[in-house]
């Protein structure tokens, strides 16, 4: 039986997307105008979905895990160059966690078809976005209510996130149109296949 494993090329891609997540968390450091009501926007959902659509479920999820663990270990890769456990305990900590199942689910849905259509890319992107916001917003509500002790309703929490969700949904739609071409270019140049972990 052939054993499926990650090769050096797989690990390089995983590391690259973990690094892109760090860049996405702090995009306002180079583009300070990317804010809504004084709150910095993040490109992390975009890079999370891009990882899922290009790398597939397992590699993308591993990339998100690596990103979370690197930050938890003390590297300043989270928003506002924060690190450690504190960002997980904050109101946006749920989004850091959500990237893992979102990347896996979007990648898994895409892998159900060897040659997925743009519609399938779109649905995969929307599935990933929905998971991010379901987990992230619910976590934010619980954090505010249970340990930050800020009285807020679940509906208010969703209302606060609506503009961010609109932005990330729009980016997901755009991504679903450009990701197929990017993947085909990578596949043609390297033979990379998102549906399979390298085997020996």
From Swiss-Prot:
GO CC term (a single one): plasma membrane
Top-level lineage group: Bacteria
Subcellular location: Cell membrane
InterPro entries assigned: BioY
Keyword Cell membrane recorded: yes
Main localization (coarse): membrane
Cystine pairings recorded for this chain: none
Transmembrane helix keyword on record: yes
Keywords: Cell membrane, Membrane, Transmembrane, Transmembrane helix, Transport
Gene Ontology molecular function: any one: biotin transmembrane transporter activity
Transmembrane spans: 13-33, 36-56, 61-81, 90-110, 121-141, 158-178
Its membrane topology: Multi-pass membrane protein
Functional summary from the UniProt entry: Putative biotin transporter.
Protein family (similarity comment): Belongs to the BioY family.
Protein name, as recorded: Putative biotin transporter BioYB
Lineage of the species this protein comes from: Bacteria, Bacillati, Bacillota, Bacilli, Bacillales
